[in-house]
A protein has these predicted regions:
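Low-complexity, flexible helical/coil segments
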Residues: 1, 27-29, 37-43, 110-116, ...
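Short hydrophobic-aromatic micro-motifs
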Residues: 2-5, 134-136
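Active-site-proximal loop/helix segment associated with metal-binding centers of metalloenzymes
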Residues: 4-75, 82-91
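Binuclear metal-dependent phosphoesterase catalytic core
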Residues: 88-90, 94-114, 121-164
Length: 164
């Protein structure tokens, strides 16, 4: 089993509903006032843009996963979701564009993932896609978890439970 920390980013490809381009998605976000602080605080240096940075990270990580010894099964770990599905639960759909990339949508199948672990959304939960378990493990901010009585707590990743 290979535990693979991925360090990927986002490329604005999780477009808000009704949009098809990065520019249109950003326009909707700015019009609604739902804009990720990354637009001001996260500088893409040495890349020109955050999406170029994401493309480079995806390419390098894909290459390394393809070279893993004996095609070992994986546990993929990333800050951002690996597929679009988890963003369907966001209160503000405009925010999805800062939550990952469509370039990794099939990686859980392509790289024989036994589990995919991610955060960023602050919506802790377990989901299943194509028979693969996806764990959103972020703690979130106190204002988000205090109404529930506390953060969700730790999750067991291995040994893996089976889909029900």
């Amino acid at each position: 089993m290979l535990i693979a920390p991925l360090f990927l980013l986002y490329d604005y490809s999780f477009h808000p509903p009704g949009t098809r381009t990065k520019e249109a998605g950003l326009a909707v976000a700015y019009e609604s006032g739902i804009v990720c602080a990354d637009e001001v605080l996260l500088h893409p240096d040495p890349y020109l843009t955050r999406d170029e940075w994401c493309v480079a990270r995806v390419a390098e990580t894909k290459r390394r996963l393809e070279e893993r010894p004996g095609a070992l099964p994986t546990i993929l770990v990333n800050h951002f979701p690996m597929t679009r599905e988890p963003t369907t639960k966001l209160r503000y759909p405009e925010f999805a564009q800062w939550c990952g990339t469509t370039r990794t949508a099939d990686w859980h199948r392509r790289f024989d993932a036994r589990a995919v672990v991610y955060g960023h959304l602050h919506i802790p939960r377990t989901t299943w896609e194509d028979g693969v378990r996806f764990e959103e493990v972020s703690l979130g901010y106190p204002r988000e978890w205090q109404p529930r009585g506390g953060p969700a707590g730790l999750r067991r990743i291995k040994p893996e439970p089976r889909a029900s």
